[in-house]
């Protein structure tokens, strides 16, 4: 009986000890005696087939190493029974995620090493359960960002390795913690307060890296030591490989809009250009939208000025009443957004009499264009939006009648009051000259003009309408062109057409009146008239010409027979003497010229018979 009691006593003493010191089959365990006499157990598990942490790790384990295994995840509270654990090493596994409860109960943990895994994120809030943590090794993972709240859990660390990750930037809150170490006192004989590893990350060197670059610039504090201080840029491409010490970055700034016009009043059909500028670092993204939610009826252009300001332009080519309203310009970067409002008021077409010293003269603006036309004290121009366009060369002008010419004399373009032209605009308005009309068919006509002061980018507009009608159509001519063909005209109809620089009001000299039947028949009629005139002239001029030639030949023969000096005293005048005489005393009277001599003149009009005067001497030109 005493033997049985002894056996039970031994089992009672040895059972718990054997359970306390049990080592998992996949691991190796070792026990060492510390200086204070306590025991520290180390468990190392490196089985490549291990996919989860062992479930029966001895509770007295102080150091646990799970390395080079196939462990992909750690279930929550797996290590909670290990209340004496001080070092947890999980290097070079296949960990892709960690539970926020993984560190629950590890109040004594001082080292957490997780290098060489596949972690994209880290449960920073889990560090609340490890108040004595001093070393955190996260090198060679896939971390791309650090949240701002991570700074609250990293203040007590003395070693932090974030090298060889995918970090492009660091939060300002964390940089502020480290900047405090730079300015804090360092006590002699003490170790550095933080060893930091940030190398081998794809840093984006823009304004968001300003604080980190400034932190490394001229670093002399012994409170913080970098494992590798020569950090380098990975992007943008222009700065790839450049060391932080060689950068000159500017601090980030939120967008700030430039002051400008807040309200615009524009006539119907004119071209409106809304402009909005902003500054910011990085350069803000500019955009337009309407306050009422309607789509934009224009084109947006972006540009950057030499001082770094960003500009956006909204081009409204032909404004209508639907374009009236509030337009919002927004400038935005990662720091925030700024907006401004511009009001556009489109006025309806107006007509009024403007005298300017000339009674009965009327000015007008087109319904949807800046061009206008008025004649005979009537408003005749109103824009009709669409008209096909074709460019052709003109060859012959069409002259208006006397009545039409008088109508164009009263044709005046002007704008009253606040719309009066500046001198520069007046010069542009006079750019079109020598407008001519040529007809191709009964249904088309060509216009040509001269614009010597126009550039290659100057665009012209053509306004035309049936004579006396109010509806006027408009065509736009390509820049650099000085001719256009108007098609779709009615035969045997009188029209008025004006050409001017786009956006300006045409003058009366830039308008012409024509008729399609006159233009088409003019060429054939002119040819017939030319043929009749030439035939009649040949019949009338042939007998006198023969008579003159015979008389000249007879005088020449008579002179040869006489052999005298008749050529100086006769009625015949020597051509060389007349054309090259240097003596003013040899001036001949018109009465000394015979009718035959006059017929030999190269000019038959009255002005050709008058002796020209050049350089103080008279000159006559004659041709046989």
Curated annotation (Swiss-Prot):
Coiled-coil zones: none
Ranges in the topological domain labelled Cytoplasmic: 549-624
Taxonomy, superkingdom: Eukaryota
Domain Fibronectin type-III: residue ranges: 431-519
Residue stretches making up the Ig-like C2-type domain: 267-336
PROSITE patterns: FN3, IG_LIKE, LRR
Residues modified by glycosylation: 156, 297, 456
Keyword Repeat: yes
Summary of the knockout phenotype: Mutant mice exhibit impaired visual acuity in optokinetic responses. They exhibit impaired synapse transmission from cone photoreceptors to cone ON-bipolar cells, likely caused by improper formation of cone synaptic terminal structures.
TM region(s), chain numbering: 528-548
Signal peptide: 1-21
Tissue expression profile of the protein: Expressed predominantly in developing photoreceptor and bipolar cells.
Compartment(s) where it occurs, according to its Swiss-Prot or TrEMBL record: Endoplasmic reticulum membrane; Cell projection, Dendrite
Segments in the Lumenal topological domain: 22-527
Domain LRRNT: 22-59
UniProt keyword Amino-acid biosynthesis present: no
InterPro entries recorded: Cys-rich_flank_reg_C (IPR000483), FN3_dom (IPR003961), FN3_sf (IPR036116), Ig-like_dom (IPR007110), Ig-like_dom_sf (IPR036179), Ig-like_fold (IPR013783), Ig_I-set (IPR013098), Ig_sub (IPR003599)
Quaternary structure annotation from Swiss-Prot or TrEMBL: May form a homodimer. Interacts with LRIT2; may form a heterodimer with LRIT2. Interacts (via its N-terminal extracellular domain) with metabotropic glutamate receptor GRM6. Interacts (via its extreme C-terminus) with the scaffold protein FRMPD2 (via the third PDZ domain); the interaction leads to their colocalization in photoreceptor synapses.
This protein's name: Leucine-rich repeat, immunoglobulin-like domain and transmembrane domain-containing protein 1
Gene label: Lrit1
